[in-house]
């Protein structure tokens, strides 16, 4: 049984640019700088296994897999050193990459590394194929049911899964959520939640990129085609940590129109990813799960290959048939560099706790806001989040029900986002994603209010 809180593809998988590649920007450098050489070798093997499985599954099911070259490029002279370092690491680990002087894009580039015959996929076609395979094998996909807890059943052989649609009993439970919804193991404190943006543009066919491209500089710039459209992506930031996410999307649009003049915006969206301090996913048994509860999380923006690789790892764990790369990743040693990254992220979390509370208590909360806007202020000493969306004003307690930070308004998605661990909520407080299992509560004495229609001014 697969239990989904909303519909399949409602969150990150349905909003990914779905590049299926063993060349992943500068990921090899990141992993090598924070892990042992054996861990990097195992990671490269895991990505090859994930790639091969997904390409094979798509070929059998017709899930819309398209072969494309993957290219990591430098947009500045300073970035070339990163390109060359990634090239050397990739070659030394068996990837048949080549070093280019120019990436062949409409803007200047200063070197690139290319890996042939990687792929891109339509994520919704992939999810439909996976759901079909699940049903063919006798499985059930339950949508619209949110898991709220996992505990011990009366039988020692089973776990009890609590959902909004009622309880389930299972011999084994896999938490395949973006971030674990159970706080055991404190994985929420080991992950960095990031949002990034993607846009689809209509451009002349001859202007479509001939591959999948990812820059090494910040802000990130990602490119691929999607049938007759250009997809651009990037401008990521910590969840709830940018004053105006709308501005982040607008900056991406400005950049696209600078280099593709006349491009017509067709659609735009954002997605959420979770990064581990060492770059390698967390996968295996969940602490205090009695050996029945497993997790897979922290795909660090490469979920197409990492999602499959962690699934293969869990299969090996459950069946007792682990491969050498799976065992090597389980035995991964945390180096000081990765510890430092984790400490830095948690210091940032602490800073955002203080900042979010100070900002909320600095001024009174409004009774209502303009359409499409949200604002946090105080009512008494309680932080209160007020928003008006589609003519309805909601007043909520602004304290995130997960760990108590104060949420911030996301003016791109029209949501309340927590800057601590990435929980997100709809304007009415309904939990959308992240580690929070409960929705935000209504502010004391408040109720949902349809906004009064504005009267036209009388003509003198």
Please provide the spans of the model-predicted regions:
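Rieske [2Fe-2S] iron-sulfur-binding domain
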Residues: 199, 376-450, 455, 460
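A glycine-rich dinucleotide-binding beta-alpha-beta segment and adjacent secondary-structure elements
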Residues: 266-274, 292-295, 353-399
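Helical element adjacent to the flavin cofactor pocket in flavoenzyme catalytic cores
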Residues: 81, 87-93, 112-172, 176
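Flavin-dependent oxidoreductases
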Residues: 149-225
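General small-molecule cofactor/ligand-binding pocket signal
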Residues: 66, 98-100, 140-142, 266-268
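C-terminal catalytic lobe of FAD-dependent flavoproteins
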Residues: 117, 217-218, 227, 240-243, ...
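Glycine-rich FAD pyrophosphate-binding loop
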Residues: 1-15
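Rossmann-like flavin
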Residues: 31-133
């Amino acid at each position: 049984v697969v239990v989904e809180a909303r519909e399949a593809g409602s969150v990150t998988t349905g909003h990914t640019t779905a590049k299926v590649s063993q060349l992943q920007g500068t990921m090899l450098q990141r992993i090598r700088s924070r892990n042992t050489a054996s861990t990097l070798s195992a990671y490269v093997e895991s990505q090859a296994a994930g790639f091969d499985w997904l390409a094979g599954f798509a070929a059998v099911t017709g899930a819309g897999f398209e072969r494309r070259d993957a290219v990591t490029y430098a947009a500045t002279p300073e970035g070339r050193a990163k390109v060359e370092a990634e090239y050397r690491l990739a070659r030394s680990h068996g990837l048949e990459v080549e070093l280019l002087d120019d990436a062949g894009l409409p803007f200047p580039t200063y070197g690139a590394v290319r890996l042939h015959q990687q792929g891109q996929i339509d994520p919704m076609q992939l999810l439909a194929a996976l759901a079909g395979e699940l049903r063919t094998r006798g499985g059930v996909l339950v949508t619209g049911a949110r898991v709220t807890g996992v505990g011990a059943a009366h039988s020692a052989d089973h776990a009890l899964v609590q959902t909004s649609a009622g309880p389930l009993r299972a011999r084994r439970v896999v938490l395949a959520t973006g971030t674990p919804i159970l706080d055991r193991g404190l994985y929420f404190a080991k992950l960095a939640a990031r949002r990034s943006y993607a846009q689809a543009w209509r451009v002349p066919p001859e202007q479509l990129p001939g591959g999948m491209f990812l820059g090494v500089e910040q802000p990130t710039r990602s490119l691929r085609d999607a049938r007759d459209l250009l997809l651009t992506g990037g401008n990521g930031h910590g969840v709830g940590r940018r004053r105006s996410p709308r501005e982040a999307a607008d900056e991406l649009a400005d950049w696209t129109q600078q280099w593709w003049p006349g491009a017509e915006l067709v659609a735009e969206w954002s997605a959420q990813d979770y990064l581990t301090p060492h770059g390698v996913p967390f996968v295996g048994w969940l602490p205090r799960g009695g050996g029945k509860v497993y997790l897979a999380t922290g795909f660090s923006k490469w979920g197409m290959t990492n999602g499959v690789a962690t699934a293969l790892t869990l299969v090996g764990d459950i069946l007792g048939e682990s491969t050498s790369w799976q065992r090597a990743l389980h035995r991964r040693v945390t180096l000081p560099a990765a510890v430092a990254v984790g400490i830095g992220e948690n210091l940032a979390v602490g800073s955002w706790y203080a900042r979010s509370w100070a900002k909320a208590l600095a001024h009174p909360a409004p009774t209502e806001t303009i359409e499409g806007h949200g604002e946090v202020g105080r009512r008494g000493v309680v932080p209160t989040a007020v928003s008006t969306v589609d003519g309805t004003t909601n007043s909520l307690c602004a304290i995130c029900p997960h760990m108590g930070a104060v949420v911030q308004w996301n003016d791109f998605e029209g949501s309340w986002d927590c800057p601590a661990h990435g929980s997100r909520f709809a304007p009415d407080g309904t939990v959308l994603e992240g580690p929070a299992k409960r929705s935000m509560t209504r502010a004391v004495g408040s109720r949902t209010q349809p906004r009064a229609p504005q009267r036209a001014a009388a003509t003198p």
